């Protein structure tokens, strides 16, 4: 599904924006904003639900304890009362469904920006070398790798897969050819010969694991040396991997600290990611009663995540997407926090802010009043 969304939805949008302004950096920004706007109703539902639960949770927990204690000998009545409580305040899991629905699109967006044209595309093939007396008993099963769209010009791209007709198991001293081809069955090298710059996108073949068990030539010919496991990597250069944008030297550049030197553009992007994440956390807590534990978590979480991304190998283009997405998320949170709350939740919040912490009676109901984003209505 992720590959389908990437190829049929995200890459065409990317092509459209690049056609308007020939800058892959601007195309990333535009693609991110368009997808975030399209997902606005779903992410807004999650933010609203989280805001509602943050206010109602203390009251819900107290009422749940009272119900369980009062009807401990009557499970049916207990479930009935707990159901009424959920209807009154909403389920704590209500915000999960919108998140789950939008996840495939976000994963596809992430995968698109990690691949061609923004970064080099690796094909990793895990192989197993067996003794000759065992390989004869193996029923060969053809292998096909996941497909990746390879850009050879700004407007020309096609899906490419790696194939092994006899599968990933081979006998000692046996040689096999790993084929790169389009999903239509055309040989990748022959397709590249139709482009003036085609040789630029020929793969580099390496043994990333198990070099004592196997070797590979630069035309993809694999030769088994002795029994064991091995991994072959074919890496195809990304068209825009070395293209810059603003202060970013190369959108495909990976790593904060490489070969003894600091990549300050990567460091700046990671720092911007942390600051925008912190801003979003701060905005989500605005207008809420002070909570020392939650406040500490809101400060520590961005620091931990930011520190992780300093050493997590993400291309600069992906980090650019994450910063833009965080800015959009912070703006969205700011807008949604301005919406009016249902009357019963507003009363709970007012009591929390004034230190009363009163529990409202169970007759309070939001189901027949208004949605969280609607203004106060008078009947």
From Swiss-Prot:
It comes from Prochlorococcus marinus subsp. pastoris (strain CCMP1986 / NIES-2087 / MED4). This is Membrane protein insertase YidC. Pfam families: 60KD_IMP. PANTHER family: CYTOCHROME C OXIDASE ASSEMBLY PROTEIN COX18, MITOCHONDRIAL (PTHR12428:SF65), OXA1 (PTHR12428). The chain crosses the membrane at residues 20-42, 93-113, 264-284, 303-323. It is found in: Cell inner membrane. It is a multi-pass membrane protein. The keyword Protein transport applies. GO terms for biological process: protein insertion into membrane; protein transport. Required for the insertion and/or proper folding and/or complex formation of integral membrane proteins into the membrane. Involved in integration of membrane proteins that insert both dependently and independently of the Sec translocase complex, as well as at least some lipoproteins. Aids folding of multispanning membrane proteins. Belongs to the OXA1/ALB3/YidC family. Type 1 subfamily. Interacts with the Sec translocase complex via SecD. Specifically interacts with transmembrane segments of nascent integral membrane proteins during membrane integration. Keywords: Cell inner membrane, Cell membrane, Chaperone, Membrane, Protein transport, Transmembrane, Transmembrane helix, Transport. GO terms for cellular component: plasma membrane. GO terms for molecular function: membrane insertase activity.
